[in-house]
Amino acid sequence: RRPVAGELFGATGTMASLGSQGLLVQQRMMARLGLPAPLASASGARDAAVEVVLYLALLAGTLGKAAQDISQLTWTEIGEAAEPAMGGRDTSSALPHKANPILSWRVKNAADTLQAHAATALRCLRQAQMRSGVGMLEQEVVAQAFTVAEECLDVSQTLLSGLEVRQDRMRENCEITQGLSMSESVQIALAAHT
């Protein structure tokens, strides 16, 4: 776990307004907030904000991978899982036998959005002379990243807490191959004799 550091350096990043007590004031303020003191002013080093966005993108990416797998398991021809019913919003307009994996799609879309935000956040590292206007973009990206991450977590919670796992269908799918999907150990044993 990497905590976000606090920030207290003043407008120019020098603590000039705090005089000779600047570091002491910063240390006490961070202790009171329960945050570590930053190594450098955020005016010159943008990595802390970028790291937060990258962390959120990683979190959403993990949830997006799970959602992608779940959406495939809900396919009619696989049928090993079903999303919680969405009151008709998940029904296909053209295929009455099909339920669309709306929750999985929402999680995957949130993960894609956060990946795009991560790329933009990385661009914000290259601010010219500390004040090039990129900071405005960074503020927007960080705020949007938290909003999208919250949605991703909320929808994932709904998806996973209501997920129907169809063990009987999993068993049927495994039996289709008549054991061939479990034949790796046989292959390894035979390889020793070739």
What positions do the PLM features span?
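Internal glycine-rich alpha/beta core junctions
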Residues: 1-124
